[in-house]
Swiss-Prot record:
Protein name per its UniProtKB record: Uncharacterized ABC transporter ATP-binding protein BB_0318
Entry keyword Ion transport: no
Lineage: Bacteria, Pseudomonadati, Spirochaetota, Spirochaetia, Spirochaetales
Taxonomic superkingdom: Bacteria
Positions of the ABC transporter domain: 2-241, 249-486
GO-annotated molecular function: ATP binding; ATP hydrolysis activity
């Protein structure tokens, strides 16, 4: 049994603790679902349990024994594994090589044991029915395969608790059903699951044994499925409304003519006005496809035309575009300060070699304008702090500021308002709308509320086909839901 007693966690940019005297025991083999509004600390709690980040106060006991210096190695030694929210596996290893390293360890100059890996994999498949081409390169896996690979990797012989942080976020309905079956199989095999979600609460009610609710820094446990939604105050009463400015912007400085293929075939043409937000909405499962396209990882036929220049391949640096990716993982390296990261991205973008004091001063001035209500001392403390010191929502805001700072042509945002607390949600909304008065923004999302809040024009797609391309003022939420079968 693992027990977390009076756990307190602070972030320097938030006045009150994100987790305030959390008490949690995990002993039974159940499917636990951790629910709460954006910014309530769900992912923070998951990382503390998995030993990835430190907590400020409290203690952890395993089978009644107090643990000193809880970290990821101690968590794994006690059978606790985390399947991350936004996995970033672009390595050249084959699947069996990755599993061999994860299951059995690896020493330099020692060959990996292929037969041992295949044998353990076949033994696992008796219970979990997850089939893989073990000789396939990891970089060639799709998002569903990557998630299931991470799950298989976590199924070491000592596995007792597996934490899934928004793991079904990019699954189709069919894939989500396969994931739920896996949770049930894990339970039958004696492995408890902690499924962390915000958007799939209604579905989670159907398969979960018990719920852990995070609200206002506190933790509640219940098996009463009827009480879940009443405990969670609806976020609709706190929705921030931005003024949508549907002026007649100057037309077509940036044109996209793209044909590409992943889940479906896409043949799409659209234009970005000189200012404003064009929002593209599509299924959750294929938003990752668009991200791969703009990262240059997906081949396409066609071109992007910016100020009369044709680009027949997508390179964010060549196009001088800002890029805010999905999720909140991988936005900043753990070991660099916010200022260092801004400088590195700026110098790479502008092809600079030597750091000048003027570059640093410009970044500081930019932050002062963006965070005008912060004292100069606090801004400097933020700039020289490492990314691990901040909450996920704050890091996402800083990443948006960074991309705004370097972008020369346009800004691409993938679901920028997801997984944010109310304050960060408001700040990000205002920042994007204000930026769109100067430069164009391409918003790509599966969230209708986010789309309608931020967009001036809307392009709706389903199964690779364009259903409509209209101005925001000419379409309602109800019509979009009907059109997209939401």
């Amino acid at each position: 049994m693992v027990e977390f007693k009076n756990i307190v966690k602070y972030f320097p940019d938030i006045d009150k603790p994100i987790l305030d005297s959390i008490n949690l025991k995990i002993g039974e083999v159940k499917i636990f679902t951790v629910v709460g509004k954006n910014g309530e600390g769900k992912s923070t709690l998951a990382k503390i349990i998995a030993g990835l980040i430190e907590f400020d106060e409290g203690e952890i006991l395993v089978n009644g024994i107090k643990q000193k210096n809880w970290n990821v190695d101690k968590a794994k030694n006690n059978g606790i594994y985390l399947v991350s929210q936004v996995p970033n596996l672009k390595m050249n290893l084959r699947v069996w090589e990755y599993l061999s390293i994860y299951w059995f360890g690896y020493e330099f100059f020692m060959p990996m044991n292929k037969s041992k890996t295949y044998k353990y994999y076949r033994w696992l498949m008796q219970f979990y029915k997850i089939s893989f081409d073990l000789d396939k390169k990891i970089k060639d896996l799709n998002i569903k395969e990557i998630y299931f690979l991470l799950i298989i990797a976590a199924l070491k012989e000592n596995a007792k608790i597996i934490i899934f942080d928004e793991s079904a976020a990019y699954f189709s309905q069919k894939e989500a059903q396969a994931f739920i079956k896996l949770l049930v199989l894990l339970k039958k095999s004696g492995v408890a699951s902690l499924f962390i979600t915000h958007s799939e609460i209604t579905d989670a009610i159907k398969f979960s044994d018990e719920f852990i609710i995070l609200k206002d820094g506190k933790c509640f446990r219940t098996v009463n499925k009827e009480s879940i939604l009443s405990k969670l105050e609806s976020s609709s009463d706190k929705v921030f409304v931005a003024n949508i400015n549907c002026n007649k912007f100057e037309k077509d400085p940036i044109k996209f003519n793209l044909f590409f293929e992943d889940f479906w075939k896409y043949d799409v043409s659209f234009s970005l006005n000189k200012r404003g937000v064009l929002g593209i909405i599509g299924e959750e499962a294929v938003i990752k496809t668009w991200e791969k396209l703009f990262l240059g990882e997906l081949l396409f036929v066609g071109c992007i035309k910016i100020d009369g220049i044709r680009y027949e391949r997508i390179n964010i640096f060549e196009c001088k575009a800002g890029f805010l990716p999905l999720g909140i993982g991988n936005l900043f390296p753990d070991n660099s300060s916010i200022l260092d990261n801004f400088l590195a991205k700026f110098m790479n973008f502008e092809n600079k070699i030597f750091i000048r004091q003027s570059y640093i001063n410009q970044i500081k001035d930019f932050f002062k304008k963006k965070m005008e209500f912060y004292s100069e001392e606090k801004i400097y403390r933020i700039l020289y702090s490492k990314s691990l010191a901040f909450s996920g929502g704050t890091l996402k805001k800083f990443a948006l500021y960074r991309e705004m700072y370097i972008a020369k042509s346009f800004l691409i945002c993938f679901s920028p308002l997801s997984n944010l607390d109310h304050k960060a949600y408001n700040e990000m909304s205002v920042a994007i709308r204000n930026y769109s008065k100067e430069k164009p923004v391409l918003l790509i999302t599966s969230n209708l509320d986010e789309l309608l809040l931020l967009s001036d024009n809307i392009l709706a797609m389903k199964m690779g086909e364009v259903l409509l391309n209209v101005s925001r003022e000419k379409i309602s939420k109800e019509k979009l839901k009907e059109l997209l079968f939401l």
